[in-house]
Amino acid sequence: MDLEIKIRDEFIKLGQLLKLADLVQDGVEAKYVITDGLVKVNGEVDDRRGRKVYEGDIVSYDGKEIKVIR
């Protein structure tokens, strides 16, 4: 696991998670990498920027894995 990101709430949106993990610079970049199918959630490509990511989910992008913790 490359990164663990701690969230306060029950979930975080996929685009926000990528920004919080410093894997993208802004929401526009997050939108493009997600809609281009470059991001996986729990091993499956997800092209929804508003996808809710919960504790225990694993997000993969650009050779890095992020685990969401609370």
What are the roles of these predicted feature ranges?
Residues K13-E55:
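A basic, amphipathic helix-loop patch mediating RNA/tRNA/ribosome contacts
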